[in-house]
Design a protein with these regions (language model features):
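Membrane interface segments of multi-pass transport proteins and intramembrane proteases
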Residues: 98, 128-138, 321-328
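Alpha-helical transmembrane segments
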Residues: 2-32, 37, 61-89, 168-381, ...
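Membrane-embedded alpha-helical core segments of multi-pass
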Residues: 88-93, 110-125, 146-156, 172-178, ...
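Juxtamembrane helix-capping/reentrant segments at transmembrane boundaries
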Residues: 41-53, 216
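Transmembrane alpha-helix boundary signature
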Residues: 66-78, 96-102, 119-133, 239-242
Length: 395
């Protein structure tokens, strides 16, 4: 895709508007959450020690929807209404879940209906494997259930990474950049703009969540479910890309790429749910067995945990990219991503639990690294905290 000034403006202006709107709305949402006592209270499985406002997702989604509306004004050929409507609906569902805790079954049904709405209104489906296993176009009877399964899986995988400060927002910002790069290579300016809008909307929340003290909020289900819907749109848009836009990119494994970007959330979710089922529990029952809980147990700070897991995910993407540059087949690219995903979740987690129990040398090495991730609130950190907290509106 040729970069023109018009294209740059279509990307930068909506993203800037999204960032400013998210910055502006944050203190007002924070005040409402405190006044109405919409907070996440500490308990045995939570990592925080004090109640934290849980409407951060509202600020993020407000920024995203503001950016989408501005893009509709600037981009004459864009039609993001189905995405806009889907995000708005799941935002309401997420807010209800944050306040009254909907049952997993109810949420699951709503997610399926929402995905069906997206399929019917946008036409996006996994209808082409682009040469993976020698398969190109697939039957609509396979495409529809596969798309529903993939989208609901993505929504729940993203929903389950909201465990430590900076993880969900940091991971999704980095992923938006990666998706944006792929959309750019595929010549899809609308999706490049959407990826930029989402990343820009997340930035203010990330700063408050990581550096803020009185301005800190959690993103909540309203945020993670909304991001899950948007990431589903990203994945299906990439996989359903016109083959002509990929004709000059031989052996570009877009399915391995999307799995690489989503690797840690997807494989960690599969691992956790598998363990729960084996133990006779509901796959949706909450516990402290996610990858981020392991890093906290090893003594890592929240930001240290977030950066470590994001770094692991970037390593998977780098391995996929190296496989692509080496000219490996699309099948080989997928197998490499799957093997690494299994190793850093299904193998790494139980291995480290054994190291913790036996207090081995490897355990002490990780603990030493974890201890180094803790920072005192001085210098840059104190400056960032003051900047984040200065917007707080007194009750």
């Amino acid at each position: 895709m040729i970069v023109t000034m018009n294209n740059l403006l279509l990307i930068i202006l909506p993203a800037l508007i999204a960032f400013l709107c998210a910055c502006w709305i944050h203190p007002y949402v924070l005040k409402v959450a405190k006044v109405k006592n919409i907070v996440d209270k500490p308990n045995a499985r939570k990592l925080q020690h004090v109640p934290i406002p849980i409407l951060g997702g509202l600020t993020v989604v407000f920024g995203i929807l503001s950016g989408i509306m501005s893009f509709q004004l600037f981009g004459e050929y864009a039609d993001f209404f189905p995405v806009f409507a889907s995000v708005f609906i799941i935002l309401i569902i997420g807010l209800l879940d944050d306040m009254i805790s909907l049952s997993p079954k109810v949420r699951f049904i709503i997610e399926i209906v929402l995905v069906l709405y997206l399929i019917l209104t946008t036409g996006f489906q996994i209808n082409d494997f682009h040469g993976l296993w020698g398969i190109d176009i697939i039957s609509k009877y396979v495409s529809l259930p596969l798309t529903i399964f993939a989208c609901v899986g993505i929504i729940n995988a993203i929903n389950l990474i909201d465990g430590v400060d900076g993880y969900s927002s940091g991971y999704t910002m980095v992923s938006c950049i990666l998706f944006g790069i792929m959309f750019y290579n595929l010549g899809n300016i609308q999706m490049v703009a959407l990826a930029a809008i989402v990343a820009a909307s997340l930035a203010p929340f990330f700063l408050h969540n990581v550096f803020g003290k009185t301005s800190k909020m959690f993103i909540g289900d309203s945020g993670t479910l909304s991001l899950g819907v948007i990431f589903s749109v990203f994945v299906i848009s990439i996989i359903s890309a016109d083959s002509t836009s990929m004709s000059a990119k031989e052996n570009l494994g877009i399915i391995p790429f999307t799995l690489a970007v989503l690797c840690v959330p997807v494989f960690d979710t599969l691992r956790v749910m598998t363990v729960r089922i084996v133990r006779g529990k509901s796959p949706f029952s909450p516990d402290k067995t996610h990858l981020h809980h392991l890093f906290i147990e090893l003594g890592y700070s929240h930001i240290g945990t977030a950066l470590s897991i994001i770094g692991m995910n970037l390593f998977v993407v780098l391995c996929w990219y190296c496989a692509y540059l080496m000219g490996l087949s699309i099948d080989a690219q997928l197998y490499i991503v799957i093997l690494i995903g299994i190793f850093i979740t299904f193998v790494f987690y139980p291995t480290m639990k054994v190291q913790i129990r036996k207090e081995t040398l490897l355990y002490h090495c990780f603990c030493k690294i974890g201890a180094s991730t803790h920072v005192t609130r001085k210098g840059f950190w104190l400056f960032a905290q003051k900047w984040a907290d200065k917007s707080v509106i007194e009750e």
